[in-house]
Amino acid sequence: METRGRRRAFSHQQDEPEENPGKRPTRSAPLYRHRNQPNANPATLERHYPCSTGRPPTGTVQPKPSQPPQPRSLLDRDAIDHITELWDRLYLLRQSLEKMTMADGLKPLKHFRSLEELLSLGGERLLQDLVKENQHVRSMMNEVTPLLREDGSCISLNYQLQPVIGVIYGPTGCGKSQLLRNLLSTQLINPPPETVFFIAPQVDMIPPSEIKAWEMQICEGNYAPGPEGTIIPQSGTLLPRFIKMAYDELTLEQNYDVSHPDNIFAKAASQGPIAIIMDECMENLGGHKGVSKFFHAFPSKLHDKFPKCTGYTVLVVLHNMNPRRDLGGNIANLKIQAKMHLISPRMHPSQLNRFVNTFTKGLPLAISLLLKDIFQFHAQKPCYDWIIYNTTPEHDALQWSYLHPRDGLMPMYLNIQAHLYRVLENIHKVLNDRDRWSRAYRKRNK
């Protein structure tokens, strides 16, 4: 009864002292203990339990803020592939520039001696820039791929460009007449003409063998191989017409008027595409009689008047890139209106250099010198090859191209070469800055 009637001590009160006054009192009970605490006699806590109710917390109350994704290592497999691919291209371009005969006028560019040195000493920023540069080079290569065949050659010389006004420069014996026939027989002119006008100073100057070669090759260019050994016509006629004309017949007054009933070009244009070939007519073009109408005004009128005339081609042969005699301004106007310049590497170097200097204003000096070196290299070869400049190309990579009798029409990718040269200049700048900082550091710590 005494036990039941005894008052219960509160948790904040100290235990009653024992009878022995000399004995030290025991430690007081904990100030606070959670009801879910598994230990019945826990150690004394000098602070409150962090959780007031429920189970003990398993994590922080406030979630961590979202962090941006960490970038991948620059030396992963894709990055190394990009840098290796770009290194091969840069090495080839650098070797070509160093070995060409005109390399004396170029400033030397600092570079890494090997790919391993680039990967180890290039630095994070430079390696990242090189990866981006190679991705850009790949994109430029992929853009031009639909315009090429499987072997890398061009599908066409003009693609959808109309009218086709071309000038062929070459000395005697470089294969200009054969080039004219090959352009039509290999279907590099799109669409293939149904009527070909061959203009010469005199009709008697054309040998019978050349006439027969023209008739055979324009017929060959009118067909393409089909399935199961068949051939498919590429125009609206089975046999294209070949018409021989003297230069004096070309300049008749009736042929300047599209609406004239006796205009021979209008009659042919009413049936389909036409082509006008002027061979050995440089002296006649330099006379007083103007024929520049056939280069600019005539094509648009034929296209408007005759819907079947979907193609208009004019190819003019010149033996000199800068003839002195041009009384009527025909040659000067022809060069302005020309969309394509087909140049033989056997032309005089002074004329080639003048042409390259005029039409490579947007390219680095090193690429212009490289183009001149290409002309000089092919001038020493016996092949009947040509270098073509297109003023309005389908793609920048096709602005300069190389025509070989066996390989076909191959793009020269001078836009990509110019981009690679700028990458070489960037590497030179990085290495030059490092050398300057190293010299400044050594000078300061002396």
UniProtKB/Swiss-Prot annotation:
Any one GO biological process: regulation of DNA-templated transcription
Residues in the signal sequence: none
Residue segments, region Disordered: 1-74
Entry superkingdom: Viruses
The keyword ATP-binding appears for this protein: yes
GO MF annotation: an example: ATP binding
GO cellular component, one term: virion component
UniProtKB keywords: Activator, ATP-binding, DNA-binding, Host nucleus, Nucleotide-binding, Phosphoprotein, Transcription, Transcription regulation, Viral genome packaging, Viral release from host cell, Virion
Compartments where found: Virion; Host nucleus, Host nucleoplasm; Host nucleus, Host nucleolus
Its job: Component of the packaging machinery which encapsidates the viral DNA into preformed capsids and transcriptional activator of the viral major late promoter (MLP). Binds, along with packaging proteins 2 and 3, to the specific packaging sequence on the left end of viral genomic DNA and displays ATPase activity thereby providing the power stroke of the packaging machinery. The activity of packaging protein IVa2 is stimulated by protein 33K which acts as a terminase. May be the protein that pumps DNA into the capsid powered by ATP hydrolysis.
Family indicated by similarity: Belongs to the adenoviridae packaging protein 1 family.
This protein's name: Packaging protein 1
Upper taxonomic lineage: Viruses, Varidnaviria, Bamfordvirae, Preplasmiviricota, Tectiliviricetes
